[in-house]
Amino acid sequence: MMASRVMASSSPSHTASDLARFAAGRGGGGSAGLGSMNVEEILRGIYADMPTPALPLVGGDRPMSPLPAPDVAAAPRTAEEVWKEITGAGVAAAAGGVVPPAAAAAAAPAVVAGAGAGTGAEMTLEDFLAREGAVKEDEAVVTDPSAAKGQVVMGFLNGAEVTGGVTGGRSRKRHLMDPMDRAAMQRQKRMIKNRESAARSRERKQAYIAELESLVTQLEEENAKMFKEQEEQHQKRLKELKEMVVPVIIRKTSARDLRRTNSMEW
C-alpha cells in the first residue's frame, strides 16, 4: 500500500510515528485506512500536530511582527520529498527491492513520465494533486441541470467581466466586427442604395418619356383631324358658291364712226 511504502522509504523516525498516530486517530483501520488516503491527507496528518512558535511581546503591550515563514527546503518533509518517496517505492516494488531516497528521487521523473505516457503527456506533482482534489470536489458537489435555468451566469473572460442570463436556450449574441469589414459592408450597402436609386430614376424617366410620346401621338392625330375638317369645309363652300352664281349679261358697245365736220371752210 501507499502508506506502507512511504513509511518504509522514509528515513526520519518521527515521520513513521506521525503516520502511525494519524492512522490510529483515523479509527485503527491500519493499512486499509491509509491506503484509501491521498497525498494531501497524509501531509495534513503529518503537519497538523506541529506547534506554532509563540510571538514575544515588545514592551509588554504589542506583539512583535510575525517571523518570516521557514524555507521549504528547511522543513522536515516537503510534498516533493513525499512524492519522490512514493514514486521511488513504486519503482522498488516493481524491481522487487527497496530503493534509498536518493535513488528514488532520481527515478521519480522517469516513473512520472511512464505514468503519463498512457495519456500522451507527463504528469507532475501539481497535476497529481490537482487531479486528486478535482475528484474529491466532483464527489462532494452535485449539480442539478434543472436548477441552472433562468440563473445569471457570471465569469471573467480575458480580464473582462461577462454577465449573461439563460432564458430557455435562446440567447442574443452581439458579434464584434472588424473596422475594415464594417467599412466594406457600408460601401456595399451604399452601392446597393445607389443602384436602387438609379433604377428608380430610370423608371421615372421611362414613364415620363412614355407619357410624352403618348401626348405627341394624340396631338398629331388631333391636328390631322382638324386639317381634314378644314379642307372639307373649303370644298363645301366652293361648291355652294358655284351653285348660287348670278348670270351677268354684258352688252357689246358699237364703235364710233368717223364723219366729216364743217368746222372749217376752204
Swiss-Prot record:
Where are its TM segments located? none
Q: Any idea which GO molecular function terms this record carries?
A: DNA-binding transcription factor activity; sequence-specific DNA binding
Family annotation (InterPro entries): bZIP, BZIP46-like, bZIP_sf
List the residue ranges of the region (Leucine-zipper).
212-219
Q: Please give the biological process terms from Gene Ontology that the record holds.
A: abscisic acid-activated signaling pathway; positive regulation of abscisic acid-activated signaling pathway; positive regulation of DNA-templated transcription; positive regulation of response to salt stress; positive regulation of response to water deprivation
Q: Which UniProt keywords apply?
A: Abscisic acid signaling pathway, Activator, Coiled coil, DNA-binding, Nucleus, Stress response, Transcription, Transcription regulation
Identify the stretch(es) annotated as Basic motif: 187-205
Q: Which residues does the UniProt record annotate as the domain bZIP?
A: 184-248
Please give the record's induction comment: Induced by anoxia, drought, salt stress, oxidative stress, cold and abscisic acid (ABA). Induced by D-allose.
What more the UniProt record tells us is: Plants overexpressing BZIP12 exhibit increased sensitivity to D-allose-induced growth inhibition.
Protein name as annotated? bZIP transcription factor 12
Gene (UniProt): BZIP12
